[in-house]
């Protein structure tokens, strides 16, 4: 993976910290690659979330990318994600979308019911997050969305794991998002061997 040179003291001092980073980030890249392989042959891509370790978001997202996954947003500055609490606070899907009309960044909205879905589509939503559906429900919703409006980006999330990923991908969604690829990835076992020259 890597070759480092330096004094014995500096190498041994940095060893554990460096290994911790490499093990953790390699675990993320590895599990992401497993998702990518599971989705092979579909048009669906795996996407990370903002559920990252404080201070390590950039590196963890880079590890997702290295594993073949795609990055969602890095923060509140590069995309808006309207979740159920935002809809409740705004009063309706329409009102929440209206508040973000001139955001200058992509706007994605989570819809929980068919009524919210229709309201989102009627009010110009182009990026939809469908959360906590079964694979059968996901297929039904994706088919409906594609029949009503072309060009909508559809993301599925909530309760999706590596074992169920393929069934969700076969719904025709554009993305599956999973916080588990960053927050629950098992570290890869990597060691450090010192040689003296």
Regions found by a protein language model. Give the residues of each.
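Acidic/glycine-rich phosphate/pyrophosphate-binding loops and surrounding catalytic core
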Residues: 1-123, 127, 133-144, 152-155, ...
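Cys/His-rich Zn2+-binding cysteine-cluster or related metal-binding knuckle/ribbon modules and their
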Residues: 162
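Active-site loop ensemble at the mouth of alpha/beta enzyme cores that anchors a bound cofactor
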Residues: 191-197
């Amino acid at each position: 993976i890597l070759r480092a040179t330096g004094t014995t003291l500096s190498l041994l001092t940095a060893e554990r910290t460096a290994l911790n980073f490499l093990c953790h980030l390699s675990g993320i890249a590895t599990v992401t690659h497993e998702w990518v392989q599971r989705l092979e042959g579909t048009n669906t891509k795996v996407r990370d979330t903002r559920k990252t370790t404080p201070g390590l978001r950039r590196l963890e997202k880079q590890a997702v990318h290295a594993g073949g996954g795609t990055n969602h947003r890095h923060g509140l500055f590069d995309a808006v994600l309207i979740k159920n609490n935002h809809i409740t606070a705004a009063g309706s899907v329409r009102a929440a979308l209206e508040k973000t009309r001139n955001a200058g960044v992509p706007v994605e909205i989570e819809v929980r019911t068919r009524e919210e879905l229709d309201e989102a589509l009627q009010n110009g939503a182009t990026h939809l997050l469908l959360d906590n559906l079964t694979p059968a429900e996901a297929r039904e919703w994706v088919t409906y969305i594609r029949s009503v409006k072309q060009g909508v980006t559809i993301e599925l999330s909530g309760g999706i794991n590596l074992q169920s990923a393929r069934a969700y991908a076969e719904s025709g969604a554009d993305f599956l998002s999973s916080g588990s690829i960053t927050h629950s990835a098992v570290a890869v076992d990597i060691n450090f061997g010192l040689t003296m020259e």
